[in-house]
């Protein structure tokens, strides 16, 4: 299995041999969907809350008399039928959204994503990405020269200059291999992997 090795202008300078176990797997759509949903669910804080009719602040006074008004009878304004009343089935903060995925499935799913990105031409390898200063403009110009508008960079080591330069770019994400996640891999149009990160990805997902 070979991937394109890009130069600083985003052009294919050569080809690089990469492990089939990570970049040459068959795509399993059901498995990828499962790990993406699990990742998003596990990222939820689970702090949303609404009030039922017993929790909203209200008066216990009857809004209007029982008979003679032509309206449907009403006991108090906390009823879910009234604006400002409680919810019938409120969301509670003790809900558990956790989805469990075992390590073998997660590794297989991540490898399937990397393999599909390689087949679609959305995955490329660069020697390294080093900056002399933490200037966002320098990194933005670098990606512009490579014709990259939406890019995720997986670098073997993210130094302070690279981190500071990338954090203010909306469509750029720079992470180390251990922080690569399925949602970001699927979302970005291009994924750049530094040469030094290939071995780390193989250790994690092979």
Curated annotation (Swiss-Prot):
Superkingdom per UniProt: Bacteria
GO biological process terms held by the UniProt record: translation
GO cellular component entries: ribonucleoprotein complex; ribosome
Pfam families named in the record: Ribosomal_L4
Residue ranges of the region described as Disordered: 44-77
Signal peptide region: none
An annotated Gene Ontology molecular function: rRNA binding
Keywords, in A-Z order: Ribonucleoprotein, Ribosomal protein, RNA-binding, rRNA-binding
Regions of compositional bias (Basic residues) in chain numbering: 56-65
Quaternary structure and interacting proteins, as annotated: Part of the 50S ribosomal subunit.
Role of this protein: One of the primary rRNA binding proteins, this protein initially binds near the 5'-end of the 23S rRNA. It is important during the early stages of 50S assembly. It makes multiple contacts with different domains of the 23S rRNA in the assembled 50S subunit and ribosome.
Family under the similarity heading: Belongs to the universal ribosomal protein uL4 family.
Name of the protein: Large ribosomal subunit protein uL4
Name of the gene: rplD
């Amino acid at each position: 299995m070979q991937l394109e090795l890009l130069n600083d202008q985003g052009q294919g300078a050569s080809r690089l041999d990469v492990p089939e176990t990570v970049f040459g797997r068959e795509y399993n759509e059901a498995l990828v969907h499962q790990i993406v949903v699990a990742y998003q669910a596990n990222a939820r804080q689970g702090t949303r809350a609404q009030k039922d009719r017993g929790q909203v602040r209200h008066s216990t006074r009857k809004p209007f008399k029982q008979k003679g008004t032509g309206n449907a009878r009403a006991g108090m304004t906390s009823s879910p039928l009234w604006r400002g009343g409680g919810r019938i089935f409120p969301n509670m903060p003790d809900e558990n959204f956790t989805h469990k995925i075992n390590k073998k499935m997660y590794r297989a799913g991540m490898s399937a994503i990397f393999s599909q990105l390689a087949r679609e031409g959305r995955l490329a390898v660069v020697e390294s990405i080093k900056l002399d200063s933490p200037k966002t403009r320098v990194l933005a110009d670098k990606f512009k020269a490579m014709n990259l508008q939406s890019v995720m960079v997986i670098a073997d080591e993210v130094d302070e200059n690279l981190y500071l330069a990338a954090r203010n770019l909306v469509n750029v994400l720079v992470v180390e291999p251990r922080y690569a996640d399925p949602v970001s891999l699927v979302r970005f149009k291009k994924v750049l992997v530094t040469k030094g990160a290939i071995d780390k990805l193989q250790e994690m997902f092979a």
